[in-house]
Amino acid sequence: FNRYNKENQEVSKIAEKQLFDYRQKNPGSCFANTEFSLDVNTAYILQDKITKLRLNDGEKIIGYKVGCTGSGTKQQFGIDGPIRGTLFDTEQLKNGTSLSLENFCRLSIEGEMAIKIDTDGGIHSVFPVIELHNFIFRGAQKTLSELIGNNGINAGIILPQKEFFNSRTYLNKRANLYININNNNVGNAELWPLPGGPVASLNWLKKNLNQYNLKLLPGHIVLAGTAAGLYPVKKGDRIEVYIN
């Protein structure tokens, strides 16, 4: 019991430091320490402790992300997911929002599909989003633990126009998702990164949440991951994500 208590206190301390760093736009500094390492389970416990701190500060969970699923990000990171991250109300932005680079650390974006959860825990609708990231790994080698402990390097999401929120058009229809930066196509991929489509991402997430006594609620948004990559953005860039 004492050992567990001590470990629990240590993870709580790391959680406070992680949240402080994140808010200072200097995320994950503890991973720069070569002596520092976490296993995947402890990384999720850390993520959930940071979430509790954010909830105590008045933020709300609006859903989760399933990350590191597609060939693009797997290749970029050199690691195999999936992993789970947590989404917050303070970081959901409207279509057409202007961002300030100073509010991020190496801002990069993904275009991907999101799932809105129905009252029965199934899929209410699906629509494209832009996911924002602080694209930084500090460990000598990229690890799933660092990715999870930094909340899947998520830094927010940009939602589409309201008319998409109830759309089921692309639930079973095949199409591609395109990412444009300054009217140049930088990447495109099939809508869903896992062979089983949106249901596969959702089932994996439900299983993961269940392991940590968490669950999806009606209205939650789930980012299903992307088969494309992560794209760095510069000052003045205009980003568009669309389905064709």
Language model features with spans:
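Short basic/hydrophobic patches in alpha-helices and adjacent helix-turn junctions
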Residues: 204-214, 221
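Catalytic-core "active-site belt" of small-molecule-metabolizing enzymes
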Residues: 4-197, 202, 211, 238
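Short, charged beta-turn/beta-strand-edge "cap" motif at the junction between a beta-strand
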Residues: 227-231
